[in-house]
Design a protein with these regions (language model features):
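Thiamine diphosphate
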Residues: 1-171, 307-308, ...
């Protein structure tokens, strides 16, 4: 099975879906002639032309509205946000028109758009370029959110998102773009709403998503080698729809839970997961649920401070040991 980067996996998904469906197009700032800010769309404009890759003005509200309107007429636009932080400029279009259209039309209209781009800190670009808005997006009925942690999932989830008839946000991570994983040549889809157990264990469940799932896996290996703790790592893949069953089954097996995310702690994704575990698996818990998240402050420009602010292997191990105490 070939090793390809997270970036290449997303590009393959986009390329294959453009070829599969004549209604799929990509739009955003510099996605065509410049090949995308992070080169995710490199070569696609040269291959597919102006009708399938559309360079837009620097107005997220305008091209998000364009995509939503086009989708109501049968087009399947993939909208690239240079930073997912910039989607805030288009909140009215995405959160009002995009999310509610199918409900408010009684199912007469769908909005099959994908909004994709990096949603992470850790790159020293400051607070306004480092948002992780998966919790905010997931709060809106009608919107779906996925956070691929590796190249295999990035390709499979992207293809599923493009084929879905509802708006799907694909939250990527710039720190993963150059990382390689095994990705098969043959066609496959990763279903929305299905979590993945990265590592089985019996003593502690770690629930995470995106890059934090990979950090949690590293921490789980260290915990087993150094402390003899058998950790099960659940990669959510999808925030909404959420695979509650996999989370609860794991917690019922290990009786302890550590929730890890790059979101800020207040009203984060893990606040909702903690509620679900408390409500549906409280009697199975042998210890309080623990959380590791970003320190609750705007992201720092300073690399040293931001490295301390975001979850890392050391902080995850510390949280796991507290959960086992």
């Amino acid at each position: 099975m070939p090793l390809i980067t997270y970036r290449e996996a997303i590009k393959q998904a986009l390329d294959e879906e453009i070829q599969r469906d004549e209604n799929v197009c990509i739009m955003g700032e510099e996605v065509a002639q410049y090949n995308g800010a992070y080169k995710v769309t490199e070569g696609l404009w040269a291959k597919h032309g102006d009708k399938r890759l559309i360079d837009t003005p620097i107005s997220e509200a305008a091209f998000s509205g364009l995509a939503i309107g086009a989708s109501m007429l049968g087009i399947r636009p993939v909208v690239e946000m240079m930073f997912m932080s910039f989607s805030y400029v288009a909140i009215d279009q995405l959160f009002n028109n995009g999310s509610f259209c199918r409900y408010m039309s009684g199912g007469l209209m769908n909005v099959p758009i994908v909004v994709r781009g990096p949603a992470n800190g850790g790159t020293s670009v400051g607070a306004t370029h480092s948002h992780t808005p998966e919790n905010m997006v997931a709060n809106h009925p009608g919107l779906k959110v996925v956070c691929p942690s590796n190249a295999y999932d990035a390709k499979g989830l992207m293809k599923a998102a493009i084929r879905d008839n509802d708006p799907v946000f694909v939250m990527e991570n710039t720190l993963l773009y150059g990382e390689k994983w095994e990705v098969p040549d043959e066609e496959y889809i990763v279903e929305l709403g299905v979590a993945n157990i990265l590592k089985e264990g019996t003593d502690l469940t770690i629930v995470s998503h995106g890059r934090c799932a990979m950090l949690s896996l590293q921490a789980a290996v260290t915990l087993e080698e150094t402390h003899g703790i058998s950790v099960e790592v659940v990669d959510l893949r999808s925030i909404r729809p959420l695979d509650e069953e996999t989370i609860l089954n794991s917690v019922r097996k290990t009786h302890r839970a550590l929730l890890v995310e790059e979101n800020k702690p207040f009203c984060g994704v893990d606040a909702q997961i903690s509620h679900i575990i408390q409500l549906k698996a409280f009697d199975d818990l042998d210890a309080p649920i623990r959380r590791v998240s970003a320190i609750d402050a705007p992201n720092f420009y300073s690399k040293e401070l931001e490295d301390w602010q975001l979850p890392n292997e050391e902080r995850i191990i510390e949280g796991a040991l507290k959960a086992m105490a």
